[in-house]
């Protein structure tokens, strides 16, 4: 199991400085992580810095609340891709999901999928705010809309990934759609447990710590 290729090396704090983005990129190159996951303002910078490598540039859409309109999410997606994004992690409309409006949720996801062209779309359902029934319906909406992945969490709400949620999401989407566990991966053991539960990608700011076999108290 090559853990490094599961990791989206993540820095999404609003106060992130350029020197911190530089460090993230250096670490991603050192460990050959799957991607760096950064806010849209840093996409073009990271894309230039990662030219000639296999490391993807991942960014976030409708983040972290998911409450912008579908048109805005689609525009954000096109803009991010035009600046060099390879993957987009979008947040569903959580309020509409809580209202039981899953046709709306599906169309919102589809707007981003259609705007993404051939780029990878991961759908953040924010598991900590949903019931199990809502998690299942949100995952089904993501699959129906043509998304490539479902993802547990933004890292900006009340909790991150849980093993039970990853298992439920994997069971719901089947073998052909990815599952990303984000938030709460603080050690190599955590990462291995999420992978065994069905995760095919790990979103974490603790990638280096994980690779060194240590543990951190970092929140994301």
Curated annotation (Swiss-Prot):
GO terms for molecular function: deoxyribose-phosphate aldolase activity. The keyword Acyltransferase does not apply. Pfam families: DeoC. SUPFAM superfamilies: Aldolase. The keyword Phosphoprotein does not apply. Its EC number is 4.1.2.4. It is found in: Cytoplasm. It comes from the Bacteria. Transmembrane segments: none annotated. The active site is at 89 (proton donor/acceptor), 151 (schiff-base intermediate with acetaldehyde), 180 (proton donor/acceptor). GO terms for biological process: 2-deoxyribose 1-phosphate catabolic process; carbohydrate catabolic process; deoxyribonucleotide catabolic process. Belongs to the DeoC/FbaB aldolase family. DeoC type 1 subfamily. HAMAP family: DeoC_type1. Catalyzes a reversible aldol reaction between acetaldehyde and D-glyceraldehyde 3-phosphate to generate 2-deoxy-D-ribose 5-phosphate. This is Deoxyribose-phosphate aldolase. The gene is deoC.
């Amino acid at each position: 199991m090559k853990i490094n290729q599961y990791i989206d090396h993540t820095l999404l704090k609003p106060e992130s400085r350029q020197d911190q983005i530089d460090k993230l990129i250096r670490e991603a190159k050192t460990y050959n992580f799957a991607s760096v996951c950064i806010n849209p303002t840093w996409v073009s910078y990271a894309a230039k810095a990662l030219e000639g490598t296999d490391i993807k540039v991942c960014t976030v859409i409708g983040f972290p609340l998911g409450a912008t309109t579908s048109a805005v999410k689609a525009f954000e997606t096109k803009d991010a891709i035009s600046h060099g994004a390879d993957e987009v992690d979008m947040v569903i409309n959580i309020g509409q999901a809580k209202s039981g409006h899953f046709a709306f949720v599906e169309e919102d996801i589809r707007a981003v999928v259609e705007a993404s062209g051939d780029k990878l779309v991961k759908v953040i359902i924010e598991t900590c705010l949903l019931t199990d029934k809502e998690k299942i319906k949100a995952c089904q909406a993501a699959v129906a809309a043509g998304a490539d992945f479902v993802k547990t969490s933004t890292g900006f709400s009340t909790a991150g990934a849980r093993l039970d949620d990853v298992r439920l999401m994997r069971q719901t989407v089947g073998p052909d759609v990815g599952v990303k566990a984000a938030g709460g991966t603080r050690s190599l053991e955590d990462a291995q447990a999420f992978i065994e539960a069905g995760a095919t990608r790990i979103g974490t700011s603790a990638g280096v710590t994980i690779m060194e076999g240590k543990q951190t108290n970092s929140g994301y």
